[in-house]
Amino acid sequence: MKSQPVTQELHFIFPLFKTISSDIMSFLVSIAGIAMLAQIVLGTFANVFIVLVTCTDCIRRRKLFLADGILTSLAFCRIGMLWVILISWCSIVFHQALSLQVRFSICVGWAVTNHFNMWLATILSILYLLKIGNFSNLIFLGLKRKIKSVFIVVLLASLVLLFPNLITVTVCETVQANGYRGNLTGKTKRTYFMNLTAMISFTLDNIISFTISMVCFLLLIYSLCKHLRTMRLYGKGPHNPSASAHIKALQAVISFLLLFSMFILSLIISGYNYMKPLNEPVHLICQLIGTLYPSSHSYVLLWGNRRIKLAFVLAMVQVRARLWLKEEKP
């Protein structure tokens, strides 16, 4: 007799608990969506500002410096990547059924923008090392003299890793689109195999890029320590232009490595949960964390470049002054 009221209470509690947990998850998804949109807007603003400043200076000087060219290309890639992420996010959250051609376009667009975003940032790390690093090694000096050729070779070599990524992404999307025609076991095996292949190809591409940037970072630290030791030997203080250039380069590279690590980790976690629907919280949170990399690192580059930083500060001062004048008017 006593067990019947308990059973009735449990039948009442479980649906209530399920409703509360569903409401909490929808609230968290909404917060993540707002944060995602804010990151994309701020990241797009920073990258557009970098493009405008570098292009304006290029037109005024009638000359494009190598660093400005890399920064501009990187900014364009990040703008494209952020908007591809936004389109993908909206299609997942709002349950929009996309055609196969649109899904192909999103996957290919993401693969291309992610690849060049990653390798242009790596080339920027190499530029910092070759421009600021101080080594007497013959190989280093030879690379420093042929810096443009080094970048062309690195960029062309990275294309060797891009094509396998494009092939695996395209085949994976085709298998997922046509998987419903076969039996469930065959579909699951094909999807697992293609996702595993795509993850291996993507991880290989990222590990090579990450390793090159890490080597540049370690060599910059060694060069800075060597420079500070020389300054101490000659009785000079540590605060000098060369040390400041080393520190700024290290800040840019370490921020890239940290944000890039978070980006890779979020994609790996999302990849291992491929069996779950894309609107599950694990995928949405991974996308939110992954968006930090292309949006936040642009502000680090903006603040580390003296010319772009000055233009940014002046623009903010002008905006603030105009707002103040509007408030003062009766």
From Swiss-Prot:
Single GO MF descriptor: bitter taste receptor activity
Subcellular localization(s) per the UniProt record: Membrane
Keyword Transmembrane annotated: yes
Regions of this protein lying in the Extracellular compartment: 1-32, 95-122, 171-201, 270-283
Cytoplasmic topological domain: 54-73, 144-149, 223-248, 305-330
Major subcellular site: membrane
Residues spanning the membrane: 33-53, 74-94, 123-143, 150-170, 202-222, 249-269, 284-304
Any single GO CC term annotated in Swiss-Prot or TrEMBL for this entry: membrane
Glycosylated residue positions: N183, N195
Record's keyword terms, sorted: G-protein coupled receptor, Glycoprotein, Membrane, Receptor, Sensory transduction, Taste, Transducer, Transmembrane, Transmembrane helix
Membrane topology: Multi-pass membrane protein
Gene Ontology process terms (BP): detection of chemical stimulus involved in sensory perception of bitter taste
CDD domains with a match to the protein in the record: 7tm_TAS2R43-like
InterPro entries: TAS2R (IPR007960)
Role description: Putative taste receptor which may play a role in the perception of bitterness.
UniProt record similarity statement: Belongs to the G-protein coupled receptor T2R family.
PANTHER family: TASTE RECEPTOR TYPE 2 (PTHR11394), TASTE RECEPTOR TYPE 2 MEMBER 136 (PTHR11394:SF81)
Other comment: Several bitter taste receptors are expressed in a single taste receptor cell.
Protein name (database record): Taste receptor type 2 member 136
Organism: Rattus norvegicus (Rat)
Lineage of producing organism: Eukaryota, Metazoa, Chordata, Craniata, Vertebrata
